Amino acid sequence: MIGRITGTLIEKTPPVVYVDVNGIGYEIDVPMSTLYALPDTGARVTLFTHLVVREDAHLLYGFGTASERAAFRELVKVSGIGARTALAVLSGMSVAELAQAITLQESGRLTRVPGIGKKTAERLLLEMRGKLGADIGATPHAVPDSQSDILNALLALGYSEKESLAALKTLPEGLGVSDGIRQALKALAR
């Protein structure tokens, strides 16, 4: 498998770029976010890649960061999401925005992406729940240590992540874990 390519950028024709590596020109499909981040032609570039081998073609997909590639790999595992749709998702939002949409179960943000309807967005949210995190580089709800303990306690008590995060926002700074849990439960009871 080809995991990374470093070479000279010879052409940018959205959504494809061509990278010359020792006389071999690789055709690589990239999301628009990666395309816009690339330097002008003639510059040296490094792309993290994902190779798809089909009966009729070998397709190479490129990404500016390893976290984009990891998100792409998770997206194509969702039933009904192919490589083209996964590229469209990553063209329409950053990995952090995608992780946040999944965490907060915001199907409306996903339906703004061309090719993603309501049912596909809901399936994507269901199948990707909990799969994009710090290892992907997305921290959509980074919280201090004491607040993460409070969040974990609320989740263990059966509250949804969305409800728990909303309750955390009502807590004053510097609150201890036990007092924080108590106040968060009061906020959730309202």
Swiss-Prot record:
What is this protein for, i.e. what is its function?
The RuvA-RuvB-RuvC complex processes Holliday junction (HJ) DNA during genetic recombination and DNA repair, while the RuvA-RuvB complex plays an important role in the rescue of blocked DNA replication forks via replication fork reversal (RFR). RuvA specifically binds to HJ cruciform DNA, conferring on it an open structure. The RuvB hexamer acts as an ATP-dependent pump, pulling dsDNA into and through the RuvAB complex. HJ branch migration allows RuvC to scan DNA until it finds its consensus sequence, where it cleaves and resolves the cruciform DNA.
Chain segments carrying region Domain I: 1-64
Q: Where is this region: Domain II?
A: 65-137
Q: Which domain of life is it from?
A: Bacteria
* Pfam families per the UniProt record, alphabetical: HHH_5, RuvA_C, RuvA_N
Which CDD domains does this one have?
UBA_RuvA_C
Q: What is this protein called?
A: Holliday junction branch migration complex subunit RuvA
Q: Which organism is it from?
A: Bordetella avium (strain 197N)
Molecular function terms in GO for this entry? ATP binding; four-way junction DNA binding; four-way junction helicase activity
Q: Any idea which UniProt keywords this protein has?
A: Cytoplasm, DNA damage, DNA recombination, DNA repair, DNA-binding
Location within or outside the cell: Cytoplasm
